[in-house]
Regions:
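Hydrophobic beta-strand-centered segment that forms part of the acyl-chain substrate-binding groove
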Residues: 88-133, 257-302
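One face of beta-strands
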Residues: 80, 109-111, 149, 250, ...
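Non-catalytic linker/capping segments at the edges of enzyme domains
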Residues: 1-67, 164-242
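Hot-dog-fold acyl-thioester-processing enzymes
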Residues: 47-97, 101, 224-271
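Hydrophobic, glycine-enriched assembly/anchoring segments
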Residues: 27, 32, 36-44, 50, ...
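Hydrophobic residues on conserved beta-strands that form the core of alpha/beta folds
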Residues: 37, 108-110, 202, 275-277, ...
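Short, low-complexity cationic-aromatic patches
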Residues: 74, 121-123, 139-144, 241-245, ...
Length: 347
């Protein structure tokens, strides 16, 4: 990639720019994570919460930029998203005794994810929790109630708003050996294993570097086994509809294209892209996953930050896909050759 990148870029596939899907985290790597969640404890008392001990594992080649280099894994945004939602769901299921149908109809309204000050690279025996911050009645919500949770996995944090029914109110504490013991088999739940059973083709990519925008057409394919993913939180909605995970991972690939074009670098020469904050909001009716969906990304601000002897590119982003909107901020350290020619406000 030269530093005199064209203002307009048209690609038949995002792979033409970022490389094969099976070597990249946001296309395939996130689906290769394995989770072990143990010692799940629900305490509905004065400080209502659910706690657990979590270990994660990734294969060595979970993401590659150069043929001979395996990147070091850490707790990812997708990991935080799905683990925190399952902990929150476990609290609701235990405390309100939600039945199978009520769990399927419960819906995620909003997700806010924040990174820690350092990446969480220790993946064994992590402390994790979701704390209930409040429940309010809402006649527009599925089930008539909205509960807000804050959660953490290691140093990463999140906030969730979940629509649900509340047929009962149980005050007894609960102890479970695993999440499956509370929620049922992970293979039948989208936020358990189901999110791994979709893959995306991102085509007709159009990036306007001057305007800091990119669009694409996203085609989603369900992998064998997805037809059984009908249980748990968002089960009714995601059996056929697009998800917040779909919105995040597809738009992140467009963000990468814009970022690399902005400073004239290639993926193989780039440094790790760090998420600082992401907000995903359900804003409309479900978009059927079987139908192509339009993805749209726009940088709402961008600047340069001298830090630890290097130069970092920071951006804030607005994006959307299939009934979800996303606002987020990301940063990466520019390689030396790109930093020498980087253009923009420095703070």
């Amino acid at each position: 990639m030269s530093t005199s990148a064209p203002a307009l870029l048209h690609l038949s596939s995002v792979e033409d720019y970022l490389g094969p899907a099976d070597t990249r985290f946001f296309s395939a790597g996130y689906r290769r994570a394995e989770y072990t969640v143990q010692d799940v404890r629900v305490t509905p008392g004065e400080r209502p919460a659910v706690t657990a001990v979590i270990s994660l594992s990734y294969p060595r080649d979970w993401s590659k930029k150069k043929a001979s280099t395996d990147l070091f894994p850490h707790v990812s945004t997708v990991d935080m998203l799905v683990i925190g939602l399952q902990l929150s769901e476990a609290y609701l299921v235990h405390t309100h005794r939600l039945d199978v149908g009520q769990r399927r109809r419960a819906r995620v309204r909003k997700i806010t994810l924040k990174a820690g000050t350092t990446p969480q690279e220790d993946l064994t025996g992590l402390s994790a929790a979701a704390e209930l911050r409040g429940t309010r009645e809402d006649p527009t919500a599925e089930g008539g109630h909205v509960s807000t949770f804050t959660a953490h996995v290691g140093v990463m944090t999140a906030r969730y708003e979940i629509e649900h029914a509340a047929p009962a109110r149980i005050t007894e504490e609960g102890a479970y050996p695993s999440l499956d013991a509370v929620l049922g088999a992970a293979a039948g739940r989208y936020y358990g294993e189901g999110f791994k059973l979709r893959e995306h083709t991102i085509g007709d990519v159009r990036a306007d570097v001057g305007e800091s925008t990119a669009t694409a057409t996203v085609t989603t394919r369900s992998l064998p086994g997805y037809q059984a993913v009908t249980d748990g939180l968002d089960g009714d909605h995601l059996a056929a509809g697009l998800s917040p995970v779909d919105c995040f991972v597809t738009n992140l690939q467009l963000i990468q294209v814009l970022l690399y074009e902005l400073d004239g670098i290639s993926r193989k020469d780039s440094n790790t892209l760090w998420m600082q904050k992401t907000v995903l909001t359900a804003v409309g009716p479900a978009h059927l996953a079987a139908r192509p969906a339009a993805a749209h990304v726009a940088f709402t601000d961008k600047w340069l930050v001298p830090l630890r002897g290097g130069l970092w590119r920071d951006v804030t982003v607005a994006a959307r896909l299939g009934g979800y909107e996303m606002q987020c901020s990301f940063a990466h350290e520019l390689p030396q050759h790109a930093a020498a020619f980087a253009d923009g406000q420095t703070i």
